[in-house]
A protein has these predicted regions:
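Cys-based phosphatases of the PTP/DUSP/CDC25 superfamily and their flanking regulatory architecture
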Residues: 1-316
């Protein structure tokens, strides 16, 4: 375990000397890599929550056959020969809710990692794009979103949704009432059969972390690490879709720490600066503040110390 201790000591020295802040500033030279033409097009400007946070054309997430626009970016991170794929996006607006769910459907993503509250300090950070009641599905133009279950924990909330394609969804929503005749029962059986058809239904977990102030850092290392490990546990299909308000600050920290935790689990080497550089080359400004960048290193020390103390025969 000498190597582990050396890694802890080296990282702690970086933190104590504020080398992480210097490292963060050195990343500022990464300028926008393309002109973000689609995001700046007049017809798409209202789809952006912030005027200065636009996805690159080369890494944006296209919608449908017409390659429609949403403020979202594919983030591919290479580390020790493995590739991790995510989607980083802004918190949906009222006018982009349909687009958001279309993105979820088309990418077959079964996990949405939400890193913000809807309102923070009196400001709207994210539109409530999901149904709050099991009895009141969210009906969109092409999809019906049904709340299947939810659980409120101390630092994050878990919601499970069923997405139904509209042509199937309309018939199934109408069958929620009581069956008074055999004709209705036959219709319901047909509806249930259609729901089992491949591609007609998609289940999604949304996990909303609520213990993180905007532009700040989480108040608990343990809560954040448990959140990420749960996210990994439930992830099955498609890229994890991560969003905060702008889709770069808290979202960037989440993706960076997730990659680091995966590396630690497999005893892989990792380089936080390299990870953040890769993210910024695919979505401008990932990890917004030096405090957020510094936090990534602090999480590493926290996890390494947990590993050290849980190893039989180890001593601090």
């Amino acid at each position: 375990m000498a190597t582990l201790r050396e890694l802890i000591e080296a990282t702690e020295k970086q933190i104590a000397r504020n080398e992480t802040f210097t490292e963060f500033l050195s990343l500022e030279h990464i300028k926008p890599l393309d002109d973000c033409i689609l995001g700046n097009a007049p017809q798409n400007r209202e789809k952006n929550r912030y005027r200065d946070i636009i996805p690159y054309d080369g890494t944006r997430v296209p919608l449908g056959e017409r390659q429609g626009y949403i403020n979202a970016s594919y983030i591919r991170i290479l580390n020790s020969g493995e590739e991790y794929v995510y989607i980083a996006t802004q918190g949906p607006l009222p006018g982009t809710t349909e687009d958001f769910w279309q993105m979820v459907w088309e990418n077959k993503s079964n996990v949405i990692a939400m890193m913000t509250k809807e309102i923070e300090n009196g400001l709207i950070k994210c539109h409530r794009y999901w149904p709050m009641s099991r009895n009141k599905p969210l009906e969109l133009q092409d999809y019906v979103i049904v709340l299947e279950d939810y659980q409120i924990l101390e630092t994050f909330t878990i919601r499970k949704f069923k997405m139904v394609k509209k042509d199937t969804g309309k018939r199934c929503i109408s069958s929620l009432g009581s069956d008074r005749d055999s004709g209705r029962k036959k219709k319901d059986k047909k509806c249930k059969a259609e729901l089992k058809r491949p591609g007609s239904v998609h289940f999604v977990h949304q996990i909303q972390f609520i213990n993180w102030p905007d532009h700040g850092i989480p108040t608990s290392f343990d809560a954040f690490v448990r959140y990420i490990r749960y996210m990994k546990k439930i992830h099955e299909t498609g890229p994890i879709i991560a969003h905060c308000s702008a889709g770069i600050g808290r979202t960037g920290v989440l993706l960076c720490v997730d990659v680091v935790l995966r590396a630690l689990e497999k005893d892989f080497e990792f380089n936080i600066k390299n990870i953040v550089t890769q993210m910024r080359e695919q979505r401008f400004g990932m990890i917004q503040t030096k405090e957020q960048y510094h936090f990534c290193y602090e999480v590493v020390v926290y996890v390494l110390r947990k590993i050290l103390t849980s190893t039989p025969g180890s001593t601090e």
